């Protein structure tokens, strides 16, 4: 029996911990209007500007996933690339920015790509304290997130204690941290490792309320996309759709269903 199959079985048995926040007290939303804390910046921040066409297309994706007035619209969503190099972190960063500009409640973007973290670089902040540290610690999640400006956008970076921490993405501490984030933020966007790198993306996809797959135009293979869809469906993850980067538009359901 393969290791991946055994892990999928484990994920199925542990679904209750994904779906509930048992034992967690309700938390008040963070003070969105408060000024951000001062964090030491590392290097020069990467540019966050988007071309008008890029912004319009990512806006369509955000509206489709979060803001279409669905009775059960997802609040916790994983974004994961089919393979490495699809630009998933770029898409996640900008989708979080746009979502925060469209809603009043707090939005948190989480760097769960412990193998190759990048969100902190896009936002121009350090990576000294974040998810990996939270998985090893007992402090409330509010001690690990940081505001990203006067807007209602917050970051849970990868953190400094990421060595060999990727295995904890399918651990009880990770499930409890996600349940805590759900209670603390209105929306949570999670930048996950690429599907081709192992079980992490599948585990996080099952933990969340939905998954958006990111493909790269003229690069992502159809076979890899089909396998990613099958793996997520086997794990019981809800696939919300896909985004084709470097053309950057949501793939219509009629096309996505043929993957």
Predicted regions, residues:
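P-loop NTP-binding module
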Residues: 1-259
């Amino acid at each position: 029996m393969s290791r991946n199959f055994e892990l999928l079985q484990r994920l199925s048995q542990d679904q209750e911990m994904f779906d509930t926040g048992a034992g967690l007290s309700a938390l008040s939303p963070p003070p969105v209007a408060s000024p951000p804390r001062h964090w030491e910046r590392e290097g020069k921040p990467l540019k966050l500007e988007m071309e008008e066409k890029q912004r319009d297309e990512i806006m369509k994706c955000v509206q489709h996933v979060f803001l279409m007035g669905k009775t059960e619209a997802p609040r916790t969503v994983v974004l994961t690339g089919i393979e490495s190099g699809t630009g998933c972190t770029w898409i996640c960063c900008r989708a979080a920015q746009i979502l925060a500009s469209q809603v009043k409640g707090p939005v948190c973007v989480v760097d769960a790509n412990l193998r190759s973290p990048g969100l902190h670089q896009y936002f121009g902040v350090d990576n000294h304290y974040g998810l990996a540290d939270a998985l090893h610690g007992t402090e409330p999640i509010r001690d690990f997130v940081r505001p990203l400006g006067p807007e209602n956008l917050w970051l849970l970076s990868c953190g400094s204690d990421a060595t060999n921490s990727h295995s904890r993405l399918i651990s009880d501490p990770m499930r409890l941290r996600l349940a805590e984030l759900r209670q603390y933020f209105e929306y949570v966007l999670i930048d996950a490792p690429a599907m081709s790198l192992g079980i992490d993306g599948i585990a996080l996809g099952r933990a969340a309320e939905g998954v958006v797959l990111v493909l790269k135009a003229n690069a992502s293979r159809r076979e890899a996309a089909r396998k990613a869809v099958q793996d997520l469906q086997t794990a019981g993850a809800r696939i919300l759709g896909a985004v084709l980067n470097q053309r950057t538009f949501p793939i219509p359901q009629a096309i996505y269903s043929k993957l």
